[in-house]
Amino acid sequence: RMKMEHNKRSSFSGKLGYVLSAAGASVGLGNIWRFPYLAAKYGGGIFLLIYILLALTFGYTMIVAETAIGRMTKKSPVGAFSSFGKSKWLSAGGWINAIIPVLIVPYYSVIGGWVIKYLVEYVKGNGQKLAADGYFSDFISNGTSTEICFAVFALFTLAIIYAGVRNGIERVSKFMMPILIVLSVIIAVYSVTRPGALEGVKYFLVPNVKNFSWMTVVAAMGQMFYSLSIAMGILITFGSYMKKDVSIEDSTRNVEVFDTAIAIMAGLMIIPAVFAFSGGDPDTLQAGPALMFITIPKVFASMGFGTVAGILFFVLVLFAAITSSIALTESAVSTFEDELHWGRKKAVVLVGVIMLGLGTLSCMGYGPLSWVKLIGMQFLDFFDFLTNSVMMPIAAIATCLLVSKVVGTKSIEEEVMHGESTFRRKKIFNVMIRYLCPIFAAIILISSVANAFGWISM
């Protein structure tokens, strides 16, 4: 019976398909929208340095562990966890991993909708309009237009998933990722060559210990979850579509390099441009999530070729958002397929309904429903907090415990070294998965919850 189930499962065509799809999953709004504003806020170069160190240790370990578990079991998170025993704890660990993408994809698609709106306006030549004060807040508080943009983004994502792993995800990733790289280079060069931009390059690339604080580490850890799509059920799901002859270690290295390179490029696209525009004014650097939708249009409006830059930039952001939203949606769909024994069509429809329902709440949370607050947050911010700060650290701890206590690191090593494949960072992996990863995840969990309730300020 096992044999039959295995053969029916779809798969990536090979290493390139897997790497570009996994990199597509991990290169998303997290890299282009979240990374630069965190780097700007938490001290530039020192943040970047800590981020890279964490990606090579913590990030690497979690990617290897999740991919290996997916490939060993050939199942999405719930089934993968439950393959190792019947306990309630195991199935809870699986479900936490599985529910995260179901909650992220709706609000992610809302932000994707904002990106579509900005792109359309740039194509129409309305760059100056986008740069006007108050444009962004007026736009997001108008429920109808955000809802339409959100629906377009959500339906496009669902259409790709409907087409399947090879025809949908892999094909789109193979098309979009190379374009994404080229665009990020073009925009970074454009940004760095503006007058006054070099100060920004220096701030972003040169670590300055003066800017270091404990929060730099916590922020870099939180960003890594986002950025490498750890603890979202995605890598377990993608691992289950990965062929046995593809090296897990090599693929992980490729994904890490790809992901970190794009995050650095995004920093080079955004931070120097902000410096050129504002002369490194601390308030502009602290703009946070608004950096991409408020500051960047102002920067483009003040420079030559602003409209062209705006179009290229938002095409890039849109591609990054789509490659990630299809990974999140795939993860959700595969859970329903595996657990409810549904066909793909039915599972896509169910996920679509959830997406439109929860996403509409996030859209309306800035407009007609702005009076509703969950622990003082609007819907979108609340879903972001719940998934990124609470559930993902718990999911990561569950994965670490699964590997160290239930599956055993030996079995993971065997899976990674299947065939001719190497596992050079075996020692780092063992120490990280047993001790450091769960501790790091617990620190993120505790500090972000304490921050949300105002016990500490980050």
State what each model feature region is.
Residues E5, G79, G112-S141, M242-D245, ...:
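Helix-loop-helix connectors at the membrane interface of multi-pass transporters/channels
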Residues H6-R9, L38-Y42, P77-I96, S109-R166, ...:
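Inter-helical loop and helix-membrane interface segments of multi-pass membrane transporters/permeases
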Residues G14-L54, G239, D250-R253, V257-T260, ...:
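Transmembrane helix-boundary motif of multi-pass solute transporters/channels
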Residues K3-K8, F12, E170, K174-I322, ...:
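Membrane-embedded translocation segments of transport machinery
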Residues S11-A22, I46-I50, K88-V102, I148-F153, ...:
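Select transmembrane alpha-helical segments in multipass membrane proteins
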Residues K373, Q378-L401, R425-M458:
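A generic transmembrane alpha-helix motif of multi-pass inner-membrane proteins
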Residues L38-Y42, A68, W89-I104, S137, ...:
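Membrane-water interface regions at transmembrane-helix termini and the short interhelical loops
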Residues R1-W33, M62-T67, R71-F84, K88-A92, ...:
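Membrane-interface "cap" regions at the ends of multi-pass membrane proteins
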